[in-house]
């Protein structure tokens, strides 16, 4: 479907466009206004975002590219409740201190990928605690709650799925969709925001906000969803067997971030190049047409471009050159390192414990299975003894040992 606005044509061609509440109306708004404000919300449940949020971050960047103003809404208040969308059970309630620390970490990561200033397309960060924390309950029920039908709320997936499975849905979580709807109304009143963007699991929450806007006699609001980020195997993106793929370089080294995208399934190459890079479509088509061993060149291009956006050109080029040196030239000097103490070496440390402590495996059980499956190497020698101990003999005359989990995860273990 061809649209009148360049923005909608662009996001459709890249695969971002999933659902829209009124595509013709939004198309007209974007065409006639060179100043449109849109928002994307992020819960503050961790001290960084992970790659599961990357599509939304790219949407922020694309809004700016076309001259529109994005709002990053951080859920300083709604995180205290937790969004039930796509969840089987309620999240643990986070202390306010943790939420505030998480907000700082998320801001740090976002500022590397989106530009924030007072310009026409400069993004702004807003915390919904600014208005939700001061709400008076009775006033909220009267002025906002009266506009919501419980029957309709129960029909949305966030509630319906839990109830169909006879899983508990607390009154606290049930209120989340009212608060998110209220956020949209507040952002319209304060900033003239007309568009909310979110993952497809947010459809019900977005529709509630638009319907509330109508009942409050606000200008027409619009909602647009992007596809949920799934791998070729149908798994949600964001976590691997080794742990979460964080966007913060202090929580996941740029080298490991680069490796994550270098090792994606062949079937994901074209889709991920469209989603996560700024490469033009013509170049993407050339890369996704590569066959056999040449596919690896497309994966390297993807990994480098994605790492540039998240960590900058310098870190991306360093990650790529390190990978080439390690995997193609056999150079261990550029491997990520982990330090253990002389006392640990003297006492001996279990290989299973070390694999887990380093983060090469998420659990000791996984480390044991890796060894039993001949997937673990020490200094390029396969170890299949689950009782293997790393001690001074392991280092011999070297200052480090190379520890490998599978073909693509390697760490240099040093002694201090």
Curated annotation (Swiss-Prot):
It catalyses: tRNA(Tyr) + L-tyrosine + ATP = L-tyrosyl-tRNA(Tyr) + AMP + diphosphate + H(+). GO terms for cellular component: cytosol. L-tyrosine binds at residues 39, 176, 180. It is found in: Cytoplasm. One of its GO terms (molecular function) is tyrosine-tRNA ligase activity. InterPro entries: aa-tRNA-synth_Ic, Rossmann-like_a/b/a_fold, S4_RNA-bd_sf, SYY-like_C, Tyr-tRNA-ligase, Tyr-tRNA-ligase_bac-type, Tyr-tRNA-ligase_bac_1. Its EC number is 6.1.1.1. CDD domains: S4, TyrRS_core. ATP binds at residue 239. Residues 349-415 form the S4 RNA-binding domain. GO terms for biological process: tyrosyl-tRNA aminoacylation. It is an enzyme of class 6 (ligase). Keywords: Aminoacyl-tRNA synthetase, ATP-binding, Cytoplasm, Ligase, Nucleotide-binding, Protein biosynthesis, RNA-binding. Signal peptide: none annotated. A motif ('KMSKS' region) lies at residues 236-240. A motif ('HIGH' region) lies at residues 44-53. Homodimer. Catalyzes the attachment of tyrosine to tRNA(Tyr) in a two-step reaction: tyrosine is first activated by ATP to form Tyr-AMP and then transferred to the acceptor end of tRNA(Tyr). Belongs to the class-I aminoacyl-tRNA synthetase family. TyrS type 1 subfamily. This is Tyrosine--tRNA ligase. It comes from Wolbachia sp. subsp. Brugia malayi (strain TRS).
């Amino acid at each position: 479907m061809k649209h009148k606005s360049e923005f909608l044509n662009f996001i459709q061609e890249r695969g971002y466009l999933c659902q829209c509440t009124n595509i013709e109306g939004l198309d007209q708004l974007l065409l006639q206004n060179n100043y449109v404000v849109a928002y994307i919300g992020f819960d503050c449940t961790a001290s960084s975002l992970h790659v599961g949020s990357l599509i939304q971050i790219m949407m922020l960047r694309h809004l700016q590219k076309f001259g529109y103003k994005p709002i990053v809404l951080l859920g300083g208040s709604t995180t205290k409740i937790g969004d039930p969308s796509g969840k089987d059970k309620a999240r643990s309630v986070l202390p306010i201190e943790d939420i505030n620390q998480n907000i700082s970490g998320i801001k740090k990561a976002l500022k590397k990928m989106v530009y924030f200033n007072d310009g026409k397309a400069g993004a702004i960060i807003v915390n919904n605690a600014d208005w939700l924390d001061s709400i008076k309950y009775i006033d909220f029920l009267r002025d906002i709650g009266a506009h919501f039908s419980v029957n309709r709320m129960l029909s949305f997936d966030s509630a319906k799925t839990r109830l169909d499975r006879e899983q508990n849905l607390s009154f606290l979580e049930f209120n989340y969709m009212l608060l998110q709807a209220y956020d949209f109304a507040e952002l319209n009143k304060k900033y003239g925001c007309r568009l909310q963007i979110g993952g497809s699991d947010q459809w019900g929450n977005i529709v509630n906000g638009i319907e509330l806007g109508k009942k409050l006699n606000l200008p027409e609001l619009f909602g647009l969803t992007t596809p949920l980020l799934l791998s070729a195997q149908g798994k949600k993106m964001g976590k691997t067997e080794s742990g979460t793929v964080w966007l913060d370089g202090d929580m996941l080294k740029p080298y490991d971030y680069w490796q994550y995208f270098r090792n994606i399934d062949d079937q994901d190459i074209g889709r991920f190049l469209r989603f996560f890079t700024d490469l033009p479509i013509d170049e993407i088509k050339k890369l996704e047409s590569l066959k056999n061993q040449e596919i690896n060149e497309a994966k390297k291009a993807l990994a480098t471009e994605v790492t540039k956006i998240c960590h900058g050109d310098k870190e991306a080029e360093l990650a790529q050159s390190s990978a080439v040196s390690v995997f193609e030239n056999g150079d261990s000097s550029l491997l990520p390192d982990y330090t253990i103490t002389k006392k640990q070496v003297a006492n001996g440390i279990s290989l299973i414990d070390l694999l887990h402590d380093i983060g090469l495996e998420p659990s000791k059980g996984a480390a044991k299975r890796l060894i039993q499956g001949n997937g673990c190497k020490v200094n390029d020698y396969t170890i299949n003894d689950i009782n293997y101990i790393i001690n001074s003999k392991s280092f011999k005359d070297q200052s480090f040992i190379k520890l490998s989990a599978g073909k693509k995860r390697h760490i240099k273990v040093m002694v201090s």
